[in-house]
């Protein structure tokens, strides 16, 4: 596949050193939450980060559950737009959506295991692999 990039979704709530890494390495990145984001929310937000060799080396020494890696040919804008659709879910019997931390490795694998082939195709969208 041409132009496949590796991306990380890193959870600031699980990996507070993310901000130091972003300042130091300055990889292309975006918060998955819509702007404007308060500092309080930013501290627990998921970030989509291009997994450059330096970022991958940094992630290798982090303790789980910092997030997940994925492969995609899509642009950051397209990928962010797609992933944002899964940040909120409606639980049975509830009227208000709740945050869903799909990017937590403790959540993503159980989720994927129960999706039908069509649901998995829809969930992955522009993602080639997780």
Regions found by a protein language model. Give the residues of each.
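Terminal low-complexity "docking" segments
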Residues: 1-101, 105-130
């Amino acid at each position: 596949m041409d132009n496949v990039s590796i991306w990380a979704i890193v959870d600031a709530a699980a990996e507070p050193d993310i901000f130091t890494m972003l300042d130091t390495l300055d990889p292309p990145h975006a918060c998955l939450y819509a702007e404007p984001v308060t500092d309080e929310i930013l501290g627990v937000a998921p970030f989509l980060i291009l997994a450059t060799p330096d970022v991958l080396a940094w992630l290798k020494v982090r303790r789980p559950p910092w997030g997940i890696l994925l492969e995609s040919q899509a642009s950051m804008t397209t990928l962010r737009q797609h992933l944002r659709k899964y940040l909120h879910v409606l639980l049975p019997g509830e009227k208000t959506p709740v945050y869903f931390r799909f990017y937590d490795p403790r959540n993503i694998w159980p989720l994927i295991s129960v999706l039908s082939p069509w649901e998995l195709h829809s969930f992955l969208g522009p993602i080639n692999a997780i």
